[in-house]
């Protein structure tokens, strides 16, 4: 499996690489993040292989910042069915913007 998050995070391969991405790169970078996907299109090349593309909006707070950030990206995935279960074999992420929202903090309603 491959997870190519792109700059500023990098490319990660295999289960050890995905583990590194989560535990050593993403979780230390983000206090909190929420990912919303939309406009999903799936194309099947045969009964066990497909590709998909979708838009993603992420709102979160970096560990190094107080203000929240917004990220707009596209996920392009290679999907495979193995032993009857669909899995993401490869995810390529194209980040379109990664911006702070000055003066905005993520907080529960008062």
Language-model-derived ranges and their functions:
Residues 11, 68-70:
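Short, mixed charged/polar active-site loops
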Residues 35-37, 70-75:
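Short, surface-exposed coil-to-beta transition loops
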Residues 51, 72-102:
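Short beta-strand edge/turn micro-motifs at domain boundaries
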Residues 58-60, 94-95:
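Short, surface-exposed beta-strand-loop junctions and turns on beta-sheet-rich folds
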Residues 101-110:
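Extended, polar beta-sheet/loop recognition surfaces of beta-rich domains
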């Amino acid at each position: 499996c491959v997870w190519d998050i792109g700059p500023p995070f990098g490319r990660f391969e295999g289960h050890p690489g995905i583990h590194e991405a989560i535990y050593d790169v993403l979780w230390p970078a983000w206090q909190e993040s929420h990912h919303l996907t939309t406009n999903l299109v799936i194309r099947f090349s045969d009964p066990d292989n497909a590709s998909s593309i979708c838009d993603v909006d992420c709102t979160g707070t970096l560990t190094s910042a107080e203000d929240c950030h917004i990220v707009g990206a596209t996920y392009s995935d290679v999907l495979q069915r193995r032993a009857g279960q669909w899995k993401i074999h490869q995810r390529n992420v194209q980040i379109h913007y990664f911006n702070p929202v000055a003066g905005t903090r993520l907080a529960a309603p008062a």
